[in-house]
Every structure is written in C-alpha cells, then in structure tokens.
C-alpha cells in the first residue's frame, strides 16, 4: 500500500538520516512507526519501508527523518523528562508501550499524562491509596494520587491555595480523574463531621442531573469547579461547587444518536410511580415524550437505567440524608421534571386572526397535566404559551398572538428555564450541606472538571462556549508553563533555552476582545438590535473579523458556516440558531406565571422579582463569560497542578491505542513543549527566604554565618552542603532555581534530617506520656493498698473511681475490684442470714427457721463458695443441720409406711427417737401403728402357709394320681381369714395369691374337670411368681400340670398317629413316636406301626429339618443332596432350596456392604438375615455396624474410605461429621469468642479518643475505618488489614469509593497472597453484617462473603466459628457449601473474577454430600469382615480442615496422633484439661470442651490445646508420674493441640499410648507428643 503523508512539524524532522538506518516514519494511524529509508525522488519525497514490509512515502527530505535509537525502544520511562532520546515519536512510542502494560499514567516533571484505558484497572484500591499516603510520592509510579498528594503537601507546606486542572477532550477521562482526586482528599484529610463523605456522595446526584449520553461518550454537560476547604490542621472542613455553562438546550433538543440529561431520559420514565410525584399519569414509554424520542436514542447499551435510578436517586439514602434532601424534595423535583417532559408534548396548530397567524394547543390534556404539576391555572398557561404581552410606553399592554413556531420556542424556553434553575438549586442545596464554619480560616484546593474540546458534524453556540473555555484553560497552561517560565528566567537573569509553543491569544481575541468586537460581543449586540437574525450576526462577524483571516474563515456554506482555527484543530460552526440560544430570556408573562406557581419547589426557583428585573435582558454568552472570568481569577490565585487526559481511540475500546489521534492531543496540549522546557528549564524554585527556611537546618550552625544579603546566604548554604547536588543550583536575583536531579538530592537530605528529628520528637512525646502514666500509677498505688487493707466498701469505691483513668492494667486495680465484689457478696449473705435465723444473740429456733429451709441452704452454699465464715454463718450451718435431720427422718418414716417393710419401719422409728422427734409428729404415729399391723399380718401368713402344706392329690405311680386325699375346705377357711384382715406386705400378698390358685386346682382335680384345670393353671402362670412360691405350692402345681398333660397328650396322640399312618405323614409320625415314648405308651399297636414307617425316611427328614432350623448353608446343601438320592420330594425340599438361595443373596449383600461400608446393602443383608433368622459371624458384624449411631457409622465409613483411598468420599464424610458435631456443640463456637481475635480493650487502645465506643462496637457494623486489625497479627499485616477494611467499606457502600468490584478483586488477590489476612477479612465482613442498618449494605456484604468463600478458606482454627455464623445468618446452605468446596477442594493460585461470581445466578457445589459410592463387586472378597485397624499406622481419619494422617514419624519428622491413642487419652486428658482450665472464663471452658467433642466426633479422642496456667490453681495431684527428657526438637506439626518440644526439656508423663503420650511440661503446657522424641530419665 502506497500513500502520501504530509507531516507539519518540520522542526522534529531535523536529524540527518543515512540510508539503510532505521528511522521514524510518520503514519496517519499510528503516529510514527519504525522503518528504513529506501530512496528519494526529485520532488523531495522520501520512500521508506516498514519492518513489516509496507512501503510508505513521506513528503520530506531524508535528512528530516529522525533516526531510531533501537537500544531504548524496549525501555518504559515513567517521566518523559528523563528520556535520553526525546522527540515526538519516542514520546508516543513510550506512551503506547506503557498503555499496553496498563500503565496509563506518565509524568512530565510535575504534569501528569492520563490515558483513558476504557476498562477497570486495580489502581484505585485503599491499599494503593495508602501506599501513596505513607510513602514518598516521588518513589511511587505516576498516578492521580501523586498529583493530589502534591497539591495537599504544597498547601500544607506553603499555606497557599492550590488547584488541579484536569483537561482533555470529551471522553478522555477527566471526570474519573476528578473522582479519584476527591476520593484521595477524603481519605487523606478526613474530617470529624464527615463532610468529605458529603463531597463523594453528592457527586452521583450531580451526575444524574448534569450528565448525558453524547455521540462520543456519556459525558458531563456542565463544568464544575469544586473547592475543598481545609482547616489549620489540614482536615477537610467544607466544600463548595460552582457549575459552569449547563447545556440546558439539551433539555429540549438533542442531535441524532444523543440523549437528554440522565435524570430526564431514564430516571423519571423508568422509575416506579412513587417517584413521579404528581405526574403519576405520565406514560410509561419514553417514546411518548418528544424531548426523549426526537434523537432516536432512548437506551444506552450496557446501562441498566432502572438500576441507575434506584442507586442514584431513590435508594441512596445515605447521600440524600447527608446533602439534606427530604422525600418531599425528591418528589417536588420529579414533578418539575415530569412537567418539563409534558411541556415538550405540546402540539400547536396554526390559525388565522386579524391579519396575523395565531396558534392553539391541539392536545389540551397535556396542558392540564403540566398545570397540575406546576400548580398554575391551565387557561393562563395555555394563553401565555400561545401569545405574549406587548408593553409600549404610554400605551396599554397589548397581547400579540404567537405562531406555532414561536409558541414552541416559548414552551421550550420555559422548560429550559425550569431545568436550569432546578440545577442551580440542586448545587446550592449541596453547597449548603458542606459549607465550612463561618469565620473559619481555611485554605483550599480547587479541582476543575469541565467539558473537553468538542468537534461535531454540526457545531453551534454550545460548542463555541465549550471550546472558548478550553482555549482559556490552554492559555492558562501556556502562561504558567511557558510564558511565565521564560519571564521568570529573564527577570532572575538565569540562562535558559527559548522554547517555541503554540500561542492561542489570537483565538481568544477573536472570540472575546472588545475592539474589534469578538464573536461573543457581536452576538450580544445583535440581540439588542430590532429585527436582527442569525444572518445579520454572520454578516457582522465577518465584517468585524476580516483582519483575522488566519483564525476565522468561511465554511462550505458561505451563508451560515464559519471556521475557527482552535489550538485543538479547525472547527466548523453553524450560525443557525445561535442568536436564539444566546438570548436565555423567558417571556415576561411566562415568568410571571412561574412566579405565581403554588408548587413548593417552583416558588423557590422563581421568587417574586421587582421592577425592571422582570424585563432585563442578560445573554447566556454574557453570563458565561462572567463565570469564566470568575473561574480564571480563582485559578490565577492558586498554585496549579495539571492532569492532561488523552483519549487513545474514538471507539471507546480497551487496549486500543491510535498513535496519531493521541499525537494530535499531545501537540494541542503543549506536552512536547512542556517536556523540552522541563528538561532545559528550572521547574523548582524558592524565594531566597523560603529556600533558607526549608534547607537551612541541613548545615549545622550555618545561621551564625549569615549576613544581611539573602542571596549571599543562599550561596553560602549551597557551598556548605555535602554532596554535589548543590553544584548545579542557580541562585537568581530573588529566587533559587534548580532541576529535578538537584530537587531529589536536596529533598533526600531534608527528609533524612526531618525523619531524624521526628523520631526524637516522637520518642520525647512517648516518654512524656509514659512518665505521666507512671506518676499517676505511683500516686494511686498507696490509695489502692489502703483501700484493700481497709476492706471498706466506700473506700474501695473511691479508690477504683480514682483509678478509672489509669490505662495500664494494674494488678492492684484488679485486686480492688475483686475485693469489692467479695465484700458486696458477704454483705448480701449476712443480710439474708439475719432475715432467716435472726441477729445474734436472739437467734430463732430451728423449728422457726424450718419453713425457710430451702432459702437457708442456698445462702449457705453461696457463703461456702467464697469461703465466707462468721459466727452468724456457723450458727446458720448448725440450724441447717438440725432441720436437715428432721426433714430426712420424716421422709424415711413416710417411705417405710408406704412400703410396709418391717425392717425399714423399725429403723426409721429408731432414728426418730434418736433425734427426739415429737410423739405428736404424724409421721411417727403412723409408723408405730403400721408396725403393729405388720406383726399381726405375719401371724396370719404363717397360718395360711400351714394350710397350703396339706391336702394335695397323691401320685400312686408315674401315670396315676389318688384324688381321695384332696382337702380344699381347710385352705378355703384360711383364705377367708386372710382376705378379711387385708394383707399389705409383699410376702402376705404373694402367699394369698398362691392359696387362691391352689384351692381352685384341688377343686377341679376332685371333680376330674380337666378343662377348668387347664384354665386355672394358665392363670397361675401369669399371676404367680415362680421364684417367690412356697415349695409346697410349686410341687402341687407341677403335679397338676403333669396329670393334665398326660391325660390330654395320650388322647390326642393316638388320634393323630392313626391319621399319620394313613397319610404317611412323616412329620406327624416323628412327633407321635417321640410323644409315645414320653407318655410310656410305646407298646401300643398304633405306636409300633408308626415307628416302623418312620424309620424309612427319618434320616433324610432329620437332615432337612436341621438345615432349615439352623439356617445353615452347609447343612442345607448336605440335606438336599441326601433327599435327592432317594427321590424324596415332600414340601421340605423346595423350602430348603429357597432358603439356600436366599442365604446366597444375603451373604453377597453383606460382603459388599462391609467391604465398602455402605448402609443400603448392609440394611438389606440385616433385614434378610432377620427374616430367615440367619446367624453367622458375618451377620453379627453387620448387626454391630448397623447398631452404631449415625456419628459412629460415619466414622467407620471414613476409615473405609481411607482404606480404599477414596479421598472424595472421605471429604464428604468429614463434612457430615462436622454437621453432626455442630448440631451437638455448635453453640460453643461463637464468633466473638474466637481465640484469634483481639480483646476489645486492646482493639480500642489503638485509638486515642473514643475508646469506649470502639470497645463496645468492635463486633458491630461501622462506616468508619478501624484503627487496628480485629485479629492478632504482626505489625506489617495489621497495616494491610486496616487497608483491606476500607475495601470492605467501599464494596458494601458504607464508604463512597470508586469501582467497588475492583476493591473486592484487590481484596481477594491480597488474601490469596497473604494467608494470614484471611481470618481477618472474614471477621471484618462478619462485623459489617452485624447490626447493619442498611439492607443494601447487607446485600453487598453477603456478596463479598460469597466472593471470599469461593476464593480462599479460613484457617482451621476459625473455620468452625465461620461455619456456625454462616449456618445462623446465611440465607441458605449455599454459603456453607462454598466454604466446604474451598476447604476441601483444589486450592486456588489466582483470584477468580469478581464480576463473574456476582453475575452467576446459581452456585453449583463441587462436593455433593448425597453422592453415592461407586461399587465394584468384582473386587469384593466373599465372606469379607473388616479387620480392626492398627491405630498408630493405618488409621486414616481425616479431621476437618487438617492434613491426612502420616505414618509413624522418625525423629525430626512430623506424625499424626493415632486414633486409638486419642480415644484412650480422652478421660485422663479431660481431667488434666479441667485442672488447667481452672480460673478460666466459662466460655473458654465451653469452647475447649467443644474442640474436644469435635475431635471425638471425627473418630479420635480429644486433642487438647495448650492451657496457660493461672494464679491460684488447685493443688496438683499427689500421684507420682514418671518423667522423660526431650532428645529431639519437635514443632508440633502446626497443630495447636500438641506440645512443642525443645531438646533438653523435661516432660511429666500422665498417660502413654501406642506411639504417643500425654504429658505436661515444666511451664504448665499440656498436650500430646511422640514418644520416640524422648528418653526415660
């Protein structure tokens, strides 16, 4: 491809270019590219070839092509002044290279170049901000924070107002730079009243009303000058905003592809009805409004308008409260915007009056809507928009009708006026909320964010004003950077190199000069001339500016267009409509109508005016120039700092750098000249006096050698300084000037000296505070000692109150408080005892005190708990003892009477007599009476037993009985006597029951009534206790049974055997033969015949019966084989076969279930075995496994998973065990009691003021940064923790910071890189979710929790507390699933994308707890029974969050305590832990117990952490333990429950296990340790 490129800057193309050397070739897209010169033609055109082989032609001689220094192409320089090879091409190349590396900021000395990346970069997090605040700015990369910091430091050091001028074309990123500067100031110099938050929170509201979507970007359509006020301490104390040139014409007209202001275009139409105020009837579709639909652009791609409205206007409650916007203000504001929209819908139709054209409103319903919203008369409104009142001096006012076009203009003017005044009111309202205190002495930093240079297809009055503003700012930059620079060097008589720059003063004269009239003045003049028009303006402008043909010339349309040569390029302006846009006057009668409105906000916007104010004409151009002059005056009174924003491409595309487009912006911004002047000039300068003040102290005692001449003093100081940094410093007539290298050297020396002095000052202040505290402690010590010695409550109270300001935790203060508590308790006990037993010596008797026995016991227990003993307490103990004896004796008597036991009753009566219980006592009288009754009952029992011993039937042979000897009458008489008396003793009742049964048996036998006898004997079986029967009763019942059985059996057997012989019923035959033998009837013919038949099949039947009865697999197989040998096919054979098949299935299920330890096959096997009564060793094991509770069963599954190497299953089971454990002991893991947290007192001490509030709110939501970390961290990590908390605040919206997702991303990346911060961040999120009053903040907090849970796990120690918090507060179980996935899944090495996490609608867990185990039956051995695992080597129980167990370790290695050792250790360890925990808080003991229980839940015994010994521990056990010496160092493997061993230490052994032991060290630490690291002493 060949093309001709004309390059204008010939000054750059000045280096001689030999042939075949690499040169910079001008390029229309990339600016410059590298290539080689090929040849030159006769016309002076050079032909080159790029490195990619592309041919290019350049209209210049070869000598004008700059040579490429290839050695520096790979360098990336962050300060263009420091470049070795400086030219346009190298500067553009350097910016492009840095842009590709996301290094969007580059310095030109103190000027910052900012290239818009069109994407989010992690450059604005609190961590980055903190680095710029706490490090030397020159050591940090270029950044907006550097500029802001320079401005702030200069304001503090010089006490001079500063300004930051942010310039660049539209879309270059000026507004973002402004936000970053304001955010930095808010963080660096935060106020006590939170005004800095007002500044940040007000910004979105201003953007809603002042930003709009343009063809290029979504940009500010107004300029703002934000002045931040600082008090004498450097803290923000107020702020103000001045708005410039709101583009109010956008309200009524937008060019194609652009939108109305954001609040108008989206936030009203798409807001819920409650935000529309009186405009609730507004159509919901934006197409219904002309002011929204005329440009054809309603929606913006990638922007959620409804969400934006909710966030910026409705839901940002914090912003509305801070800037003092009420709900009425919002509703009134929405009413006015709705009225503006409906004004745009007025449709005017033409009519004919008396020789004039008239107009009327076609859609009068719109007039009614607007009138309702504005609270004005509809008829008056319609009249005033269709006609105007003409007032001529000396004549009556006349109403003149308006044409449809004029009526539309009048309506548009009203809409613009309302919106413009509404915006001014908004700014005023915001300023009032941030106004500094009256009379306060302040310094300011102003930040200017104003519209960038604009060149559109159609440019009108708005673009002329905007570009005029940019010309002014460019002139300010030129004056400060170039003109004033050279002027200063000349006045100071310093050598310098002259720099040529683009001077835009002629363009400013063209626009604003008075003679000849500039374009703005011509516009103003034409407004006051009758019958003037855009055409007359165009003619007059060309006439007055004919002499400035270089800056102004005609356009393509010579009747309307003119071209101005701006510093940023030629702009074609269309004069059509300029006159009307410049008028900015509202028709008088519309103004009067507006002033008559009853709408609250309209009354404020249009207050009643007086006199000629109603008719005064103030042009928009005139207002604008006045504002601009005021702005320039303010800027000129400040020390400026510059940020030049560059737009790298017009497509707003990330990672796309158009070199030529950027090159043009750099040229117009004066960047290249700034680079050269910074290199050749002296950017750093001080007056002689200030130079001496700033650096004079670097040379000791130099002031003693000073003379009256300040210049000579400066020379003397520079010559006396060490090093060569002062050799190139220029001392001018009034100033000292020098370049960047000298500045760095001087500042380095000064910083070192200041730091040294600062350290000395800090040490002195700390020493002073320490001495003051020591004096207060010494002064309070005797007071505390006397108070303790006095044991006087009032004295103690006074001493404690006197010591309340002592910050140090003195033991004497603790002792006083403890003694006060003891004395208060003693007083309480004494008062209660006096109430109960009376004051000495008039004590009550124990009979009087007995009703208060329970209360007396309680108060004496309290006295015992504090070892409180006095005569009164001892008397109470004696009375308590006496009462207790009486109470116990009464209860003993009552129980003995109720039980009717003679021995107990006699003992109770004896005790009552011993303690002197009164005979009138009811329980004693009842006892004596019952004892007499028992004596009589025993006599009757003896008579009854005698009657039972005689009168039973006599056996005459083995099969016959004699009934003649039966006697039932005597026994019946004895029964009658017993029932009449009423037996109560147990022996009496049992004997009576026996007698009743026996008398019935005798009666039935005597009558040969065997059926009744059978029923009586059955009843005896249920009513009589065989073990307590008398021997005679047992004998008589047995005999009756035998007689009954024999008689029944003989008859039944003969009948059945006869039938069995007929049917060849083998089972009945077998039964008959056996019964005949027992009945002694084997010699009867029927039985002999049956025996002969039975012998034929008895063997086969016996085998089958045995196999089926025993459910024995081997017996069944043998019996079936035997039956098959002689073809026996009765029902036993198929039954046996079915049973054998079932056994095969059950055994297979048992094999699979035990091998894989899966419940389903185990339950099938057990159910089948129960059903058929199968009993084997394997089935016993199945029963034992299933008999375990859920926890124990999962432990067995966990062992199996480790045996099979199924890590995924082991993790799932581990989680289930945790769930069980938390169900039992979860309450012990309270977040506030996590051991890694700081104590609230320590947390509060990190701040000098407000400590009590900090202590109480340590675990509650706050909108302020925290003074230190929530967890115990080293000092370096504490700083990171406090910075990360700002990320949390910013993401949750509790503190306005830009780019919340970037804050979350930064937090995730830092926590991945620094594991020690992970617990801290989780604690911070939990803190911010606790008692948070904002639902939006809570939602964002859980989003941040979700991001963290999917990125990094907490520590093992904190995981339980976090999981319990998620279970209690999380909306669902997904948070716990995320935690488990992160704990047990693959660890991340890089942070996930926050936006992707938040965009995910559903979380898919990686660990499915319900996932079934994959079973391979081919590997299962038959008859499998799991062996008991050897605990020290093979157990694989994985603890939650811990590493798998290792094999036993050799010395120097780490090993996991075996499960068996843990289980055996449980009891003694618990006892030792209880001793070590004495004097600890209750919660600590519960939490320790919880950890122990958790370890048992995971299949092991309790792992116990190190327990610190406390004062006044109980005495150690007297049992002697053996001791061992440590021979190898052991670090505990990172497990806090094990001892850390140091070679040579002595351990007292409490208990030994397989490979491990439990013991205590000399300093009181207790825990497990490996035996092979020690040797016996």
UniProtKB/Swiss-Prot annotation:
Disulfide bonds: none annotated. SMART domains: MYSc, MyTH4, SH3. Keywords: Actin-binding, ATP-binding, Methylation, Motor protein, Myosin, Nucleotide-binding, SH3 domain. CDD domains: MYSc_Myo4, SH3. Coiled coil: none annotated. Residues 1444-1466, 1483-1497 have a biased composition (Low complexity). Signal peptide: none annotated. GO terms for cellular component: cytoplasm; membrane; myosin complex. PROSITE patterns: IQ, MYOSIN_MOTOR, MYTH4, SH3. ATP binds at residues 168-175. Residues 1442-1466, 1483-1516 are annotated as: Disordered. The modification N6,N6,N6-trimethyllysine is found at residue 119. Residues 1519-1577 form the SH3 domain. GO terms for molecular function: actin filament binding; ATP binding; microfilament motor activity. Residues 755-782 form the IQ domain. Belongs to the TRAFAC class myosin-kinesin ATPase superfamily. Myosin family. Myosin I heavy chain is single-headed. This is High molecular weight form of myosin-1. The lineage of its organism: Eukaryota, Amoebozoa, Discosea, Longamoebia, Centramoebida.
